Amino acid sequence: MNQYPAERIARARVLVVGDVMLDRYWFGEVDRISPEAPVPVVRVARREDRLGGAANVARNVAALGAQVTLIGVVGADEVGHRIERMAAEEGVRTDLVSDTEHPTTLKMRVLGRQQQLLRVDFEQHPEPAALDGISAAVARQLAQHDIVVLSDYAKGVLDRVESIIAAAVGHSLPVLVDPKGDHYERYRGATLVTPNRAEMREAVGRWKTEDELAERAQRLRLDLDLEALLVTRSEQGMTLFTDAGRDHADAAAHEVYDVSGAGDTVLATLAVMRAVGLSWGDAMRWANRAGGIVVGKLGTSVVTAAELAGEST
């Protein structure tokens, strides 16, 4: 694989649109069981916040050295303000829509001895007025970017994804989608869709052989008018389907510690590498390496340009 294209990446402009959320971690020690119920008592010693969902995709793009703008919905609350501050600190430009009726999506995890004990989610779908704001923000930003990434976590921001794809295609911009659910018709006309193994099974059913997977993947790709379809397959690596056929990269992870946000890292790396003109195959291999690095980290994390460049030497 070629040398890390740092200079070209610095000029790349990536627009990320999707479900923005905050991942909040409470770390502590467990030394007893509650007398109120048979559950562990965690003495919280440290709290850490990380950008999640589409915001994690954006921070991964920034960590690789590219320019990035994030569009999403936040509430008029502490969590929303925290996301805006953290995004700025990580080099992510934002064009966020404020929904005063609903809270910002928050995923709170409680960990003891580095093991996750509990996750609590706070979320509601945005109001139609907020979705109007998303459409307006996309219209403002498209002309200033080279590629569009849609990060769908089924929280409602991409309920009008068809119109966003159409607008991007109207500006001759590639559209990369991390999908959710089994209604893939919504993503028709995008450039690439990146389902994981479970999502692919949900969309096309189970397969028994690689040939059967290839047949179903190519049929789905052609039905949706996609240029490429990438199936991420955990320990089996990732498989790319295009007009040229099937291409595969074996898993690159040295040690799997936490898979949270790994798909975000893969999507961000694909977008950056395609924005600078790399082929689908080369972009997939860079993304595979990035995914292999990030699963060795705890929680939603990023892969830096230095880490990825080091892996290529």
Curated annotation (Swiss-Prot):
The protein's Enzyme Commission number: 2.7.1.167
Output the Pfam families linked to this UniProt entry. PfkB (PF00294)
InterPro entries hit by this protein: Carboh/pur_kinase_PfkB_CS (IPR002173), PfkB_dom (IPR011611), RfaE_dom_I (IPR011913), Ribokinase-like (IPR029056)
Pathway terms, separated by semicolons: Nucleotide-sugar biosynthesis; ADP-L-glycero-beta-D-manno-heptose biosynthesis; ADP-L-glycero-beta-D-manno-heptose from D-glycero-beta-D-manno-heptose 7-phosphate: step 1/4; Bacterial outer membrane biogenesis; LPS core biosynthesis
Write down the top EC class of this protein.
transferase
Record: residues binding ATP: N196, R197, A198, E199
Please give the start and end residues of each transmembrane region: none
Q: Which UniProt keywords apply?
A: ATP-binding, Carbohydrate metabolism, Kinase, Lipopolysaccharide biosynthesis, Nucleotide-binding, Transferase
Catalyzed chemical reaction(s):
D-glycero-beta-D-manno-heptose 7-phosphate + ATP = D-glycero-beta-D-manno-heptose 1,7-bisphosphate + ADP + H(+)
Q: Can you tell which superkingdom this protein's organism belongs to?
A: Bacteria
| Gene Ontology cellular-component annotations | cytosol
Gene Ontology annotations of biological process type = ADP-L-glycero-beta-D-manno-heptose biosynthetic process; lipopolysaccharide core region biosynthetic process
Catalytic residues at D264
Which terms does the record give in the GO molecular function aspect?
A: ATP binding; heptose 7-phosphate kinase activity; heptose-1-phosphate adenylyltransferase activity; phosphotransferase activity, alcohol group as acceptor
Which family is this protein grouped under? Answer: Belongs to the carbohydrate kinase PfkB family.
- NCBIfam families (alphabetical): rfaE_dom_I (TIGR02198)
Q: What is this protein called?
A: D-beta-D-heptose 7-phosphate kinase
Q: What does UniProt list as this organism's lineage?
A: Bacteria, Pseudomonadati, Pseudomonadota, Betaproteobacteria, Burkholderiales
